[in-house]
Amino acid sequence: MVLETISRIIKIQLPAYLKKLPLPETIGGFARLTVSDWLRLLPLLGILALLGYLTIRPFLPKKKKQKDSLINLEIQKENPKVVNEIDIEDLNRTNVCYCRCWRSKTFPVCDKSHIKHNELTGDNVGPLILKKKIL
């Protein structure tokens, strides 16, 4: 029963549908088609567009997976845990910025590498700012 239905669609209904389509013989003939003609062509054009997309999809560039899944990519990788200890009383300046994005070339001091990191990843990380309170 199912195979008979599929056979009928392929052998009878599909050829009848294709014969009724208003396909012009020249490219210029497409400009003379009416709105109702375009509406009758729409299902066929949709199927052809879908088949074309499915055909070229394997050749389209893949979306890049975010390689920044690790936070610390290169700083002190030989240590199981990176810890930097800074004595606050030794602060010479009134403001000191420390890196929290792990991209700074002057780690642990921030060199504003987080700006590029935020643009690439959509992250919103910023530095840790220590201010010396002057009494």
UniProtKB/Swiss-Prot annotation:
Cytoplasmic side: 61-135
Cofactor, free-text remark: Binds 1 [2Fe-2S] cluster.
Membrane-spanning intervals of the chain: 38-60
Protein name: CDGSH iron-sulfur domain-containing protein 2A
Keywords, alphabetical: 2Fe-2S, Autophagy, Endoplasmic reticulum, Iron, Iron-sulfur, Membrane, Metal-binding, Mitochondrion, Mitochondrion outer membrane, Transmembrane, Transmembrane helix
Superkingdom per UniProt: Eukaryota
Topology versus the membrane: Single-pass membrane protein
Keyword Mitochondrion: yes
Record note on quaternary structure: Homodimer.
A Gene Ontology BP annotation from the UniProt entry: autophagy of mitochondrion
Record's GO cellular component terms: endoplasmic reticulum membrane; mitochondrial outer membrane
Role played: Regulator of autophagy that contributes to antagonize becn1-mediated cellular autophagy at the endoplasmic reticulum. Participates in the interaction of bcl2 with becn1 and is required for bcl2-mediated depression of endoplasmic reticulum Ca(2+) stores during autophagy.
Main location (coarse class): endoplasmic reticulum
Organism field: Oncorhynchus mykiss
Record PANTHER family: CDGSH IRON-SULFUR DOMAIN-CONTAINING PROTEIN 1, CDGSH IRON-SULFUR DOMAIN-CONTAINING PROTEIN 2
Assigned protein family: Belongs to the CISD protein family. CISD2 subfamily.
Disulfide bridge positions per record: none
InterPro entries assigned to the protein according to its UniProt record, in alphabetical order: CISD1/2 (IPR045131), FeS-contain_CDGSH-typ (IPR018967), FeS-contain_mitoNEET_N (IPR019610), MitoNEET_CISD (IPR042216)
Compartments reported by the entry: Endoplasmic reticulum membrane; Mitochondrion outer membrane
Cofactor: [2Fe-2S] cluster
GO MF annotation list: 2 iron, 2 sulfur cluster binding; metal ion binding; protein homodimerization activity
UniProt: [2Fe-2S] cluster binding residues: C99, C101, C110, H114
Pfam families membership: MitoNEET_N (PF10660), zf-CDGSH (PF09360)
